[in-house]
From Swiss-Prot:
This is UPF0125 protein BU253. Belongs to the UPF0125 (RnfH) family. Pfam families: Ub-RnfH. InterPro entries: Mopterin_synth/thiamin_S_b (IPR016155), RnfH (IPR005346), RnfH_sf (IPR037021). Disulfide bonds: none annotated. It comes from the Bacteria. HAMAP family: UPF0125_RnfH.
Amino acid sequence: MKIIKVTVVYALPKIQYICQVDIALGSTVKDAILKSNLLNLTNDVSFHHNRIGIYNKTVHLKFKIKDGDRIEIYRNLTIDPKEWRRNNVFLSKKLKKIY
């Protein structure tokens, strides 16, 4: 049985969890995340609530991983990007009027 190395990553605003995992060839994304023990390190990660990808491309939990893959667990957005931009433009216009 051949062993491959993958990286499992979960980033928060102030801390990043990066875990190197040695796992059998033919394993799935779910197997690598479970082996990384990331689910026990933080309560924010869930298979049902977080999207998962490899190098910024969304994949399913049953996706077969390859040697050197970087498995990324994505956080949910706290605000809609359009709403954030709208608020940001409003604030910048308001600040310009003051000066």
